[in-house]
Curated annotation (Swiss-Prot):
Keyword Ribosomal protein: yes
Name assigned to this protein: Large ribosomal subunit protein bL32
Organism: Buchnera aphidicola subsp. Baizongia pistaciae (strain Bp)
Record-linked Pfam families: Ribosomal_L32p
Disulphide-bonded residues: none
SUPFAM superfamilies linked to this entry: Zn-binding ribosomal proteins
Top-rank lineage group of the source organism: Bacteria
Length: 54
């Protein structure tokens, strides 16, 4: 089993944890229906960039 030689510093621990936070998803409003959706994703109606894709 691997055992560390030195105790990691508070700085190194913080740098490792710097990406562990939860991000709020970026939202966009559809031009045609006005529906709010996640950026770069289709809406529930099947529209993407104002065009019907599904």
């Amino acid at each position: 089993m691997a055992v560390q030689k030195n105790k990691p510093t508070r700085s190194k621990r913080g740098m490792r944890r710097s990406h562990d936070y939860l991000k709020i998803p970026l939202l966009s409003k559809d031009k045609l229906s006005g529906e709010i959706h996640i950026r770069h994703h289709i809406t529930k109606n099947g529209y993407y960039k104002g065009k019907k894709v599904i």
